[in-house]
A protein has these predicted regions:
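Substrate-binding beta-hairpin/strand module that engages nucleic acids
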Residues: 70, 74-76, 107-126
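Generic C-terminus detector
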Residues: 100-101, 113
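Single conserved hydrophobic/aromatic residue that forms the stacking wall/gate
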Residues: 1-10
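A short acidic/basic microdomain associated with nuclease active sites
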Residues: 20-43, 47-49
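Residue-level detector of beta-strand face positions
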Residues: 33-35, 62, 114
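Non-catalytic protein-protein interaction segments used by genome-maintenance enzymes to assemble
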Residues: 38-96, 100
Length: 126
């Protein structure tokens, strides 16, 4: 089901059109792994911790524009129309970490963050 849904994104959605164009121009990047070190105090409520926590992840995709980077992540959560804010809230911290990692890896600013909800067939700006 997910691959069919992704095909729908790629064919019909504005995001898909932009991804196709970026791919043609060599500006589309998919499944980008990263490992970043963060002070524990930045990730947890334990103030004063001097330890470094390694955060490992895989960014579903991003593409480069003249203005910077558009970050995107696919979500399979079961949602009802109107639940967009729930999705944004649920993944806010994850997307902040992805944004930070991309900016450090590329030296470019992330100018837009997008979540694609398969259950809503909708692209949501985060």
């Amino acid at each position: 089901r997910m691959s069919r849904g992704l095909g729908d994104v790629y064919k019909r959605q504005t995001l898909g059109r932009k991804m196709r164009q970026a791919q043609k121009e060599g500006r589309l990047h998919r499944e980008q792994p990263f490992v970043m070190g963060y002070p524990a105090r930045d990730l947890f409520d334990e103030r004063g911790e001097d330890e470094t926590v390694l955060v490992q992840g895989i960014i579903d995709g991003y593409y480069e524009t003249d203005d910077g980077i558009v970050l995107m992540d696919y979500k399979t959560d079961s949602l009802k129309p109107g639940d967009e804010k729930v999705l944004i809230s649920r993944y806010r911290r994850q997307m902040e970490l992805y944004r930070d990692a991309l900016e450090k890896m590329t030296g470019k600013k992330v100018v837009k963050c997008l979540l694609y909800s398969f259950s809503l067939s909708e692209t949501i700006e985060c």
